[in-house]
Amino acid sequence: MALFSSRTGKRPRIVPALDDDALARVLRQVSKRGGGVKSTEVTLVAGFLEETGDNWDRRSHRVSVLAGETAESGSDLASAWLTRSPKDPDALVFHSWVGLMHGLRDRHLEDAGQLVTQCHRAAELSPADPLPWVVLLGMARIERYPQSEVNAIWREATGRDRWHREAYLQMLAHLSPEEGGSSAAVLDFIDVVRARIPANAPCAAIELTAAVRQYQGLVAQGGVRAMTADQLWNGGQIAASLEQAASLWAKPGFFQHAAAQADLNVLAYALCAAGRAVDAHHVFEALQGTVTPWPWDDDGPAVQRFEQHKAKAERGRQGGVRGA
């Protein structure tokens, strides 16, 4: 993977595919408009995911991005593919993921029973694939399954791919206070998984992701909590985790997973939130202008906020002032 290689700096922009050039080409070829879908588009996406094979990390990234773009555009791609190939596990998973994207947006699943059935059918047809179980984890967020059922789905997903990034993110969201969980549940989850996850695993950013969400939650409350939110980064396990991430993640070749640039966005944001903009400079450089909507869009347009913090990091580096 050519992550953080010889690309020249580019103007900040949102790139759903991140550094997956093959995925970017497919996205450009698939219609962005709702309504009718050409059979060639179905063939293109089906062939593309088939070629991805059993690289579960890369497959998850590609399916999630394609599903997200399909849901946002209102395209009939998922339905057209499932109609054409109702026994294709890729078609079943893709259609279910698009349904999940709609459900997360609307906070309600249309025909949840059908989507669940599709996931189980996909799991039967492709038993080694963790993705049907990951989609079920996402559905559990909306349907608020009992924790025992969620844990069973979690074991199915991570039993197939122990460090599956999306599985960890879905579980984190399910446990969050914003979705009916609690801060204590999130902390318990992070405490359990922290020591087990390799430093460069696809899910390595889960602790920092949880910390950023906690920070944003404090800021959103306003008042004293917002004014003192930056204290979250001072001392303790969160500070230690941020320090380790700052020293390792942006090194060329350290991360190899498909969504590494998304995790670097989280790191850059966390360093800026902690008053360490100077330390974020090398992370911004590694990103080469690739912006993810979250976490930057929490308090304004993502690209604009990214540019502002990047400029602040550059000024601080030139002035030699830590936390500028």
Predicted regions and their residues:
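Long amphipathic alpha-helical scaffold regions
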Residues: 153-162, 175-198, 295-315
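Structural motif corresponding to the intra-repeat A-B loop/turn of tetratricopeptide repeats
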Residues: 102, 109, 143-144, 180, ...
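Extended alpha-helical scaffolding segments
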Residues: 252-299
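Alpha-solenoid helical-repeat scaffolds
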Residues: 13-20, 35, 53, 86, ...
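Amphipathic alpha-helical repeat scaffolds of TPR domains
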Residues: 47-66, 86-104, 127-138, 160-177, ...
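Alpha-helical repeat scaffolds
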Residues: 5-8, 40-48, 73-85, 111-123, ...
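Extreme N-terminal leader/anchor segments
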Residues: 1-76, 80, 84, 281-287, ...
